[in-house]
Amino acid sequence: MSDTDPTTATDDTLRTPIVAVLGHVDHGKTSLLDKIRGSAVTAGESGAITQHIGATAVPLDVISEIAGDLVDPTDFDLPGLLFIDTPGHHSFSTLRSRGGALADIAILVVDVNDGFQPQTLEAIDILKRTQTPFIVAANKIDTVPGWNPNEGQPVQQTMDAQSDRVQSDLNEKLYEIIGELSDNGFSADMYWRVQNFQANIGVVPVSAETSEGIPDLLTVMMGLSQRYMKEEMEIDTSGPGVGTVLEVKDTQGFGTTLDAIIYDGTIRNDDTIVVGGLQGPIITDVRALLRPRPLEEIRTEQEFEQVDEVAAADGVKIAAPELGDAMAGAPIRVIRDRDRSEVIAEVEEELAEIEVTTQEEGVVIKADTLGSLEALSSTLEEEEIPVMRAEVGAVAPRDVRVAETAGESTNQAILAFSVDVLDDARDLAEQEDVKLFEDDVIYQLVESYDDHVTAIEEAQQEQILENITRPAKFRILQDHTFRQSDPAVVGVEILSGELRRNVNVVRWENGEANRVGTLKTIQDEGEDVDSARAGERMAVSIQGPTVGRQVEEGDDLWVEIPEKHAKILEQELKEDISVDEREALSMYLEKHRNRDPFWGK
């Protein structure tokens, strides 16, 4: 932070806790952040709230002002809260540091009307995996029919002011959310009933629209941070800075820049830094540290102003050469008075910690950040979907070339999470029949791919079934011989299975299957058909036998199934054939196995 920054902590050994806001799209994350920011600007003196890159700092005195009687500032040593403004809804998974989450604590925003949605579950998975403590903001309480808003009031106060019916409706919605948390393995209750926040999740009813409950939200966040995280907040602000890249972007006049959160030490504008890149660590010199100009100066031509240094915890835009390969979610470390090779090794080690297991055969995955790549990879591993290549960045033609080398057609696919697909890559994928799946929600991305795999497998099964001789038993009907031989044309009833054309036919005698001929055609009322099912009566032509010699009216005949086909039907395709085909197969196998117990095994 610059010397003049009003949010500088008085106790420079305690940094501001970093807060991430997560939740399903449209559940009110952005509105909640905007309202916290807006309330802070209103409550603070002019200039008390500084604009930050990728973050909003709310100092303790401003929290105290918003929370009123709920907070006694003398109870707290921590300087305030730093809310990360994650780009897009999904980027919490970006925010990793030293193998865990960058955020010290999180707010999971859930719409009281909608409850848990796919991205809520996705957020919960990430919170579990990174072991990040969180509270639930049950948003949109003002939308309960009959709600009487009380702008900016603590939630218990405003709930007490509602009618019994409204209170009852709201409580029902809140307990549904508590139930859903329980289904996902978390014990939860209204925050004012929670005794131990380490064992239970506190639910804070809020309205981003009317600010009701926001005093409680800030109070609970401060209380949790102070009580459970004070030791973790102790840092040496004079030491070399450590941080995480939020976004890599082009900034006019500065070229490629990094939006970053510094969570330990200090970064200065003449420091040499090591940043995680696509091809490994990037070593570069800081040319400028940039902050947005204060709101009252926004009309000036330059959007940013330069500062000499930034101390943890804070957001900053870093301008430096050779940042083209830097990755969102990657570590940043200042070298300063440390051994260069040691710092490079630490960054390499941190990059290696990103748990993405690849195999020789599998799909290609692309994601916008290292953290999302890790989250997607972890989900695919749970679903037992193999990954051949995993990278950060847009889908390029070379990704298509890799995907098309997959041996299995189900693996000739690219799963793209929140990234662009270059036009020439899209054209090439179409040309080479590589399937592209794009989504901003991991669950939906994986679901689309699963549907694709199911469709391929079903088509393959159908193809196999087409080439397999299907089981059937049929009877020659009495008084239904239309032609005795060459070919014999008779009326039949299918007793079980499915009778098809161009199959060999056997009659069982003394435990032996004797081939009597080949069934050539099936007719239904003079029309040729491909098949007939159990219960149907048809006219069939059989090349080979003469009725009255090799076959008789009233005989039961069977389709001759090659032993190899019988084995495939029993062991691989049993679930894909109908119940009466299974019955016909079972009887056919039994007849053979009476003679040879290992037939078709």
UniProtKB/Swiss-Prot annotation:
Binding site for GTP: 23-30, 85-89, 139-142
GO cellular component terms, semicolon-separated: cytoplasm
Residue ranges, annotated region (G4): 139-142
Gene Ontology molecular function, alphabetical: GTP binding; GTPase activity; translation initiation factor activity
Region (G2): 48-52
Region G1, annotated ranges: 23-30
Region ranges (G5): 207-209
Any Pfam family: GTP_EFTU_D4
Region of interest (G3), ranges: 85-88
Keywords from the UniProt entry: GTP-binding, Initiation factor, Nucleotide-binding, Protein biosynthesis
Residue span, tr-type G domain: 14-229
Presence of the UniProt keyword Cell inner membrane in the record: no
HAMAP family from the UniProt entry: IF_2_A
Annotated family: Belongs to the TRAFAC class translation factor GTPase superfamily. Classic translation factor GTPase family. IF-2 subfamily.
NCBIfam families: aIF-2, PRK04004.1, small_GTP
Function: Function in general translation initiation by promoting the binding of the formylmethionine-tRNA to ribosomes. Seems to function along with eIF-2.
UniProt protein name: Probable translation initiation factor IF-2
Taxonomic source organism: Haloarcula marismortui (strain ATCC 43049 / DSM 3752 / JCM 8966 / VKM B-1809) (Halobacterium marismortui)
